[in-house]
């Protein structure tokens, strides 16, 4: 178990943030230990669509992290199959206002040398005949974007690092204490093991109550509960990431459009937005379709107030809206689930350095799959500059 060994970097948390911190540090020749409390990580990094869509991120900040992440994903895919598929993203407008936003968004992307193409309603339907004619006003296609399988991507990257980059990894290894001692970080596990690191990164997701809880201000963090579902395998018809009208109204990039502040919201849209619902589709290799999602929020530290139920009302609202958008072979629901992630309220990610050697990276919210590789690349670069 390498007990008492000192590493350049110890990382607590095997999700996407921890995994890519390890990846970038190893690429810089650092010795890295990755500790995971469970048999394998299974939280927000895995309970998502697996869409890498920089197009939805706030322009001139997280949009750039998303573009960098896409390159990292594609470069890594050339070395090992981490499930990246360059299939592009479709935004589908449901009314004239959303179509105006797509037109403005295309120009904003052009200004940033990010390829996109606008399609009329008839062109969109010709390429995507499963969309319903009465829903579609037009579409915007971004060819460079990609999808991944969230159930396998992080695991495959970790195995690649173990086999090829010298990563040391321990699962079933809950960390119960982190402190600075003798000028470096001392990490203690529930099995009474001690590890040492010149630096330690805490990337432990929504579990903020165990390690240094006093450094997670509840006023700056909230927890989101989302609901998603998987429809039964069926004929392959969705060739790209599919993002719809409510997504156009929700995603940060569109807030940069000149007309965004002027759009009208109907009472039906407001009912869905009250549950944080916008509709995304992604079809997996086995033909199953991931559909969602919704968003509810509580302050950090109050996640028990969510309860443990998956709301059938929310699922029915999502299915009803999805059926307005597209025709499918069947709408049989194979499984439903809830996901939880920590999100900053005053910043797009929560970072803090404690005693010069302990680094907290958390609260990246729902943009982890799209932006984590790029964001962690910059963080590790600064750490070792």
Regions found by a protein language model. Name each.
Residues 2-15:
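Beta1/beta-strand and adjacent pyrophosphate-binding region of the FAD-binding site
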């Amino acid at each position: 178990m390498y007990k008492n060994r000192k590493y350049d970097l110890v990382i607590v948390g095997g999700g996407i943030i921890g995994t890519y911190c390890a990846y970038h540090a190893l690429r810089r020749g650092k010795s890295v230990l990755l500790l995971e409390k469970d048999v394998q990580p299974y939280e927000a990094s895995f309970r998502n669509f697996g869409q890498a869509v920089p197009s939805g991120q706030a322009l001139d900040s997280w949009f750039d992290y998303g573009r960098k992440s896409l390159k990292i994903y594609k470069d890594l895919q050339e070395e090992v199959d981490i499930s990246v598929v360059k299939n592009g993203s479709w935004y589908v407008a449901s009314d004239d206002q959303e179509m105006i936003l797509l037109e403005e968004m295309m120009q904003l992307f052009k200004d940033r040398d990010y390829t996109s193409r606008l399609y009329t309603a008839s062109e969109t339907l010709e390429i995507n005949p499963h969309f319903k004619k009465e829903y579609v006003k037009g579409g915007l296609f971004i060819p460079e974007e990609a999808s991944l399988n969230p159930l396998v991507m992080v695991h495959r990257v970790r195995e690649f690092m173990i086999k090829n980059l010298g990563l040391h990894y321990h699962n079933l290894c809950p960390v119960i204490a982190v402190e600075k001692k003798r000028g470096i970080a001392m990490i203690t596990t529930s099995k009474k093991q001690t590890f040492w690191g010149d630096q330690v990164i805490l990337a432990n997701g929504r579990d903020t109550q165990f390690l240094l809880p006093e450094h997670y201000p509840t006023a700056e963090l909230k927890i989101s509960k989302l609901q998603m579902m998987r429809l039964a395998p069926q004929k392959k018809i969705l060739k790209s990431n599919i993002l719809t009208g409510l997504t156009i109204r929700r995603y940060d990039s569109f807030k940069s459009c000149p007309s965004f502040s002027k759009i009208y919201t109907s009472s039906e849209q407001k009912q869905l937005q009250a549950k944080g619902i916008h509709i995304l589709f992604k079809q997996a290799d086995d033909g199953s379709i991931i559909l969602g999602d919704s968003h509810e929020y509580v302050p950090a530290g109050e996640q028990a107030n969510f309860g443990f139920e998956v709301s059938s009302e929310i699922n029915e609202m999502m299915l009803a809206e999805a059926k307005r958008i597209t025709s499918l072979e069947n709408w049989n629901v194979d499984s439903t689930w809830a996901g939880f992630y920590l999100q900053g309220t005053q910043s797009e990610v929560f970072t803090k350095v404690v005693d010069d050697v302990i680094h907290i990276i958390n609260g990246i919210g729902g943009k982890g799959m799209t932006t984590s590789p790029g964001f962690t690349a910059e963080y590790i670069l600064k750490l070792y500059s």
